[in-house]
């Protein structure tokens, strides 16, 4: 039974001035008999995606028996889709990028089970751009969040596919032959 009156995930209240509840992620899938995966958006608190003391901008694994959770990915902006092919042992995640740069990411299942955090780069790397209105309001945003087009050159995992302009990516599913 997953529902419990006890908290299994605790909030971190060090959000920044750009907090916005519509970048919330929120996909849940079953990983195995004891674990589920949950995507959590960055809520426009970009700096928290790289902060391992925060759950914003992460995918977490929650043990349904113990309610314990672990971060399995960091550097996510707004993960919308998760698809786990149990037969072929691969996990695909879809994510909204900023002003373009929607991504399809491959997540290493073995690293999830070995408790290795996989980092996808947000807000340091992205194929997308800062929204023009944000740049107008804060011209120094590139100093804090540069959005390098390469992920791998900065120590992050490259998406297997990115879309510019944005396609408004959401859930991902497998279609039969």
What are these regions (language model features)?
Residues 2-30:
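Asp-box/WD-like beta-propeller blade repeats and closely related beta-sheet repeat scaffolds
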Residues 14-17, 41, 45:
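A broad detector of the eukaryotic-type serine/threonine protein kinase catalytic domain
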Residues 42-177:
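Beta-propeller domain segments
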Residues 34-37, 89-90:
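Generic structural signal for coil-to-beta-strand starts
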């Amino acid at each position: 039974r997953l529902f419990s009156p006890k908290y299994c995930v605790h909030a971190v209240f060090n959000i920044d001035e750009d907090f916005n509840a519509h970048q919330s992620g929120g996909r849940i899938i079953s990983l195995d008999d004891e674990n589920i995966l949950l995507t959590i958006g960055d809520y426009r608190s970009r700096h928290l995606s790289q902060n391992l003391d925060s759950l914003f901008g992460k995918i977490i694994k929650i043990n349904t028996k113990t309610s314990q959770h672990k971060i399995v990915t960091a550097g996510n902006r707004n993960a919308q889709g998760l698809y786990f092919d149990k037969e072929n042992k691969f996990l695909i995640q879809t994510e909204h990028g900023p002003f373009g740069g929607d991504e399809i990411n491959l997540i290493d299942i073995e690293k999830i089970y070995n408790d290795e955090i996989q980092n996808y780069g947000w807000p340091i790397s992205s194929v997308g751009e800062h929204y023009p209105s944000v740049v107008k309001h804060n011209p120094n945003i590139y100093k804090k969040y540069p959005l390098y087009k390469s992920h791998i050159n900065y120590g992050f995992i490259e998406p297997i596919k990115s879309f510019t302009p944005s396609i408004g990516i959401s859930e991902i599913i497998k279609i039969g032959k």
